[in-house]
Amino acid sequence: MNEYTIHFGGLAGHSSKPHLGVSAVEYASRYVNKLLEIREELKKRGPKDCIFDPPHSTLSIGGIKGGIAHNVIADKCSVEWETRPVTKADAEFVTNEIDKFANEALLPEMQKVFPQSFIKKEVIGEVVGFDRLDQSEACEFVSSITGDNSREVVSFGTEAGLFQEVGISTVVCGPGSIEQAHKIDEFIELDEIKKCLKFLEGVKDKSVN
């Protein structure tokens, strides 16, 4: 999962003379439209027999912030977005396409009117993907406690990939459901908490023995 905030800087002015200003909001809007085009391309690039749901890399616009009034050309705007690539190639595709558009299409237009115009990319986080392995000490350890030998994949991110990248056998196991995550009144069922406590007791017993 890769998260970014893109900062646009233009030139403020009165809306009656738009040719004398550089609207950061307008250029940010064009940037977002390009992201949406890329998102459609990602759907076509989904690998065959993909085990994820949906079966392709995703891209989402989380927020657009800019402008102070109807009659003022906005000199500042920011776009918050993320992508969840299912392949490394998709991650590179998204980065190359949107950066090229920003630097070669948008920025020259902005700086033609106001040389100090800018587009700055702030990396909020780039989380390494977590691969499902056929053989995993961590999975076998968890299965020995839970009795569940299933192996599932999900389309949301954790820090598991960071541990796996440095050679630590890793598994994601815990209470709750993504269906209740990141929403108003987010919750975990009490039965899930009870299962978690039982699991932790099992971890303790296995560690002692």
Over which residues does each language-model region extend?
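Metal-dependent amide/peptide-bond hydrolase catalytic core
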Residues: N2-N209
